[in-house]
Structures are given as C-alpha cells and as structure tokens.
C-alpha cells in the first residue's frame, strides 16, 4: 500500500513541509529577538564643569548608553543619563520639539538643538557634546546668555508707532505681500546657535550684535506697520554693530530652523548705504 501523507487544507501543502517551515520561522524569529536584545552601547563624551565645587576644572566625562533603550535624539540620551546614570549632569531643555531653543549646544563640532539632532548610530564613534562655544558657562552644558538677551533687548524687538493715539483702539493691518516679507525672519527661536558659531561674534561679542539679533532687527525694520525704520538704522551707525559681519556664513549653515541670518545682515547693509545717502543730501 502507498504511504499515507498528511495534507494541509491550505493550498494542499503536506503537513510535514509546513511543520519544517514553521520550525524555520520560529528559529528566525528567535534569532531576530536575540539580535534585538543585544546591547548597542554608544559612548557620549560630555563637557563637565561645576563652579560651585572648589578646584573643579573643565573636563570631558564619558557615559555609555544602550541605544536599544533610548530614544533617537541626543536629548533623549542626555535625559536618560541624567535620570539613570548621573543626576548631577546639567543642561537646559523644554519643548523637545525644536521650538523653544533651550537645548542649543555643540554636538560633534556643530551648534544645533539636542532635541532635533539624531544620535549617530555608529557605535565606534564617540559623540562629543559641549556647551555653545565662546560663551561663559554657568555649569556643564548651560551657557550664560545674559549678553545675548541684552543685545536682543537693545534693538527694541517690538512694533513702534509715532502716533500712539489709536493704540489699543484699532488693528494695524498690512497687505499679504508685506506680511510675506517677514517669512524667514520671524521664525527665529533665539537659540543662539548662529551667533555662537560666528568668529566675528567670538572676538567682538561685546560690540557686534551678532547674526540672531541683527536678523531680528531687520525683521522690525521692514515691517510695514513700524514707523521707526530710520531710527533703528541710526542706532547701528558705528563700526561694530553691523559691519563686523564678514559673510563667513557659519550662521546660515548652522541654523536649526533653516533661516538665513547672513542674507538679513546683507540687506541691513544695503539699507544703511541708502540711509547714509539720504542723510548726506538732507
């Protein structure tokens, strides 16, 4: 008698064949699970300095993070280190969405936001993290932005009207075309990535306003609702406020929002030339 072969009701495959396939599938899944469970250790070398500790000097401290148990962004790794490894690690962070600019720092040689910079998954490379360059450091990855904000305040970054009699009583309208002129300017989040990547700002940060502040100055200069364009230009009539920009363009390259501060500064220079000509003829 012929041997009886079990047949599956699904497409008529012999049960023995399906059994072997099932075993192979289970073995494959087991291998994948084992591979997924294997630690993926990434090293982070992070700048550390605590001024409250007597004799403490700036140093780099290395931490190890299993990328299988960490989110994809550098900020995820920093939070994991602080929560699970070293609670003394200090850094700024807030929105985690690239909106607030709090977590600006220098990662692998470039200024960016830790919340939007993906972790380099090459495990053979050590990711190096520093505070924003050429700034006084408060602690670890926290720079002192006091001068930066004071410069921002100095440009009076708000709408100014010469006739304030209607203030609060009517809307200040502008055309769609005039509103579109502000695109690429108002989106600045004041993270200071651009200013702290600028060599001119490194050496003249006390006098040169820097890319971020100048871009915001330009934003208010060209706002059709503002009445103080000439006064804003007059405040920049010195050798340092604007003219320390040498179009190196580090600012545009590093901006995490994809803005172009270098172009805005060039436009201010053109406005300054026209302003000087008008003053000479007056």
UniProtKB/Swiss-Prot annotation:
<keyword id="KW-0004">4Fe-4S</keyword>
<dbReference type="GO" id="GO:0051537">
    <property type="term" value="F:2 iron, 2 sulfur cluster binding"/>
</dbReference>
<dbReference type="InterPro" id="IPR006058">
    <property type="entry name" value="2Fe2S_fd_BS"/>
</dbReference>
<keyword id="KW-0479">Metal-binding</keyword>
<keyword id="KW-0560">Oxidoreductase</keyword>
<dbReference type="GO" id="GO:0045273">
    <property type="term" value="C:respiratory chain complex II (succinate dehydrogenase)"/>
</dbReference>
<keyword id="KW-0496">Mitochondrion</keyword>
<keyword id="KW-0001">2Fe-2S</keyword>
<keyword id="KW-0408">Iron</keyword>
<keyword id="KW-0472">Membrane</keyword>
<feature type="binding site">
    <location>
        <position position="245"/>
    </location>
    <ligand>
        <name>[3Fe-4S] cluster</name>
    </ligand>
</feature>
<feature type="binding site">
    <location>
        <position position="103"/>
    </location>
    <ligand>
        <name>[2Fe-2S] cluster</name>
    </ligand>
</feature>
<feature type="transit peptide" description="Mitochondrion">
    <location>
        <begin position="1"/>
        <end position="30"/>
    </location>
</feature>
<dbReference type="GO" id="GO:0009055">
    <property type="term" value="F:electron transfer activity"/>
</dbReference>
<dbReference type="GO" id="GO:0048039">
    <property type="term" value="F:ubiquinone binding"/>
</dbReference>
<keyword id="KW-0816">Tricarboxylic acid cycle</keyword>
<keyword id="KW-0249">Electron transport</keyword>
<feature type="binding site">
    <location>
        <position position="95"/>
    </location>
    <ligand>
        <name>[2Fe-2S] cluster</name>
    </ligand>
</feature>
<protein>
    <recommendedName>
        <fullName>Succinate dehydrogenase [ubiquinone] iron-sulfur subunit, mitochondrial</fullName>
        <ecNumber>1.3.5.1</ecNumber>
        <ecNumber>1.1.5.-</ecNumber>
    </recommendedName>
</protein>
<dbReference type="GO" id="GO:0005886">
    <property type="term" value="C:plasma membrane"/>
</dbReference>
<dbReference type="InterPro" id="IPR017900">
    <property type="entry name" value="4Fe4S_Fe_S_CS"/>
</dbReference>
<feature type="binding site">
    <location>
        <position position="100"/>
    </location>
    <ligand>
        <name>[2Fe-2S] cluster</name>
    </ligand>
</feature>
<dbReference type="InterPro" id="IPR036010">
    <property type="entry name" value="2Fe-2S_ferredoxin-like_sf"/>
</dbReference>
<keyword id="KW-0007">Acetylation</keyword>
<feature type="binding site">
    <location>
        <position position="251"/>
    </location>
    <ligand>
        <name>[3Fe-4S] cluster</name>
    </ligand>
</feature>
<dbReference type="GO" id="GO:0005743">
    <property type="term" value="C:mitochondrial inner membrane"/>
</dbReference>
<feature type="modified residue" description="N6-acetyllysine">
    <location>
        <position position="53"/>
    </location>
</feature>
<feature type="region of interest" description="Interaction with SDHAF1">
    <location>
        <begin position="148"/>
        <end position="220"/>
    </location>
</feature>
<dbReference type="InterPro" id="IPR025192">
    <property type="entry name" value="Succ_DH/fum_Rdtase_N"/>
</dbReference>
<dbReference type="GO" id="GO:0006121">
    <property type="term" value="P:mitochondrial electron transport, succinate to ubiquinone"/>
</dbReference>
<comment type="similarity">
    <text>Belongs to the succinate dehydrogenase/fumarate reductase iron-sulfur protein family.</text>
</comment>
<dbReference type="Pfam" id="PF13534">
    <property type="entry name" value="Fer4_17"/>
</dbReference>
<keyword id="KW-0411">Iron-sulfur</keyword>
<feature type="binding site">
    <location>
        <position position="191"/>
    </location>
    <ligand>
        <name>[4Fe-4S] cluster</name>
    </ligand>
</feature>
<dbReference type="InterPro" id="IPR004489">
    <property type="entry name" value="Succ_DH/fum_Rdtase_Fe-S"/>
</dbReference>
<dbReference type="GO" id="GO:0008177">
    <property type="term" value="F:succinate dehydrogenase (quinone) activity"/>
</dbReference>
<keyword id="KW-0003">3Fe-4S</keyword>
<dbReference type="GO" id="GO:0006099">
    <property type="term" value="P:tricarboxylic acid cycle"/>
</dbReference>
<dbReference type="InterPro" id="IPR001041">
    <property type="entry name" value="2Fe-2S_ferredoxin-type"/>
</dbReference>
<dbReference type="GO" id="GO:0051538">
    <property type="term" value="F:3 iron, 4 sulfur cluster binding"/>
</dbReference>
<feature type="modified residue" description="N6-acetyllysine">
    <location>
        <position position="57"/>
    </location>
</feature>
<dbReference type="InterPro" id="IPR012675">
    <property type="entry name" value="Beta-grasp_dom_sf"/>
</dbReference>
């Amino acid at each position: 008698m012929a041997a009886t072969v079990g047949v599956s009701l699904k497409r008529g495959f012999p049960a023995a064949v399906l059994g072997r396939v099932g075993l192979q599938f289970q073995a494959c899944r087991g291998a994948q699970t084992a591979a997924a469970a294997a630690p993926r250790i990434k090293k982070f070398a992070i700048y550390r300095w605590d001024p409250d500790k007597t004799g403490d000097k700036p140093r780099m401290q290395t931490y190890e993070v299993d990328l299988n148990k960490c989110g994809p962004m550098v900020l995820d790794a920093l939070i994991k280190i602080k929560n699970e490894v070293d609670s003394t690690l200090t850094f700024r962070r807030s929105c985690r969405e690239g909106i607030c600019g709090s977590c600006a720092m220098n990662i692998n040689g470039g200024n960016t936001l830790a919340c939007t910079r993906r972790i380099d998954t090459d495990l053979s490379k050590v990711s190096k993290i520093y505070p924003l360059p050429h700034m006084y450091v408060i602690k670890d990855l926290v720079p002192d932005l006091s001068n930066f904000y004071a410069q921002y305040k100095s440009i009076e970054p708000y709408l100014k009207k010469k006739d304030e009699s209607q203030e609060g009583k009517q809307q200040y309208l502008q055309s769609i075309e005039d509103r579109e002129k502000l695109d690429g300017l108002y989106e600045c989040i004041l993270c200071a990535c651009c200013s702290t990547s600028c060599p001119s700002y490194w050496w003249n940060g006390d006098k040169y306003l820097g890319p971020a502040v100048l871009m915001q100055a330009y934003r208010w200069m060209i706002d059709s609702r503002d009445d103080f364009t000439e006064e804003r230009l007059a405040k920049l009539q010195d050798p340092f406020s604007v003219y320390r920009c040498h179009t190196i363009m580090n600012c545009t390259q590093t901006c995490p929002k994809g803005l172009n501060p270098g172009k805005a500064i060039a436009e201010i220079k053109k406005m300054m030339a026209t302003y000087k000509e008008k003053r000479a003829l007056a």
